[in-house]
UniProtKB/Swiss-Prot annotation:
Pathway linked to the protein: Amino-acid degradation; L-phenylalanine degradation; acetoacetate and fumarate from L-phenylalanine: step 5/6
GO molecular function terms listed in the Swiss-Prot or TrEMBL record: glutathione transferase activity; identical protein binding; maleylacetoacetate isomerase activity
Residue ranges constituting the GST C-terminal domain according to the UniProt record: 89-212
Pfam families registered for this protein in UniProt: GST_C_3, GST_N_2
Cofactor: glutathione
Chain sites annotated for binding glutathione: 14-19, 56, 68-69, 108, 112-114
Name of the protein this chain belongs to: Probable maleylacetoacetate isomerase
Organism of derivation: Caenorhabditis elegans
Catalytic activity: 4-maleylacetoacetate = 4-fumarylacetoacetate
Annotated InterPro entries: Glutathione-S-Trfase_C-like (IPR010987), Glutathione-S-Trfase_C_sf (IPR036282), Glutathione_S-Trfase (IPR040079), Glutathione_S-Trfase_N (IPR004045), GST_C (IPR004046), GST_Zeta (IPR005955), GST_Zeta_C (IPR034330), GST_Zeta_N (IPR034333)
The keyword Oxidoreductase appears for this protein: no
GO terms under biological process: glutathione metabolic process; L-phenylalanine catabolic process; tyrosine catabolic process
GST N-terminal domain sequence ranges: 4-84
Gene3D superfamilies cross-referenced by the UniProt entry: 1.20.1050.10, Glutaredoxin
Amino acid sequence: MSNQKPVLYSYWRSSCSWRVRIALALKNVDYEYKTVDLLSEEAKSKLKEINPAAKVPTFVVDGQVITESLAIIEYLEETHPDVPLLPKDPIKRAHARAISLLVASGIQPLHNLKVLQLLNKKEAGFGGQFAKQFVVEGLTALEILLKQHSGKYAVGDDVTIADLSIPPLIYSANRFNLDLSPYPTVNRINETLADIPAFIAAHPDNQPDTGLNA
């Protein structure tokens, strides 16, 4: 195995990249951060040479390229098992994955930058309206699931893969000025996670490219 640091292609405000940054921090993985300006066609064109989808996060380890945030996190789980993000109990593990997928597949893609830009081209401001509707629907479902499965954290009393998606989702909701009072369980867990050093280190405000295109 190479001694070269793995490389994370990231953007400070990318929800998907944020999830991976949290996992890397929790597992104490030393890596190189490479900024991808998502508003730059040149930057995306260069990234496409590595990742055909030209998306972040893109993770390169030992010359191998891994794409998609949850696939990267699962890889880290298998290669750095000392800080587990998947519960041992199969049912809890399934719940943790389901919550993570709800956000990563059912909520986040509907308000990502590419979608908002496309919708706003058709009608000014429509992207924001569209995003708010689906974020609210997603938060409503997430609140119910967390009431069913949470302890101190999203699934039980240990941080799991499910928790990694909560801070980015709340961050996005705040950017859309959504009322978060209907989601007390989501808020409680988000506030608890905010005190964990790994979550602080992974926050958008603490990245090398913080403020780019702000």
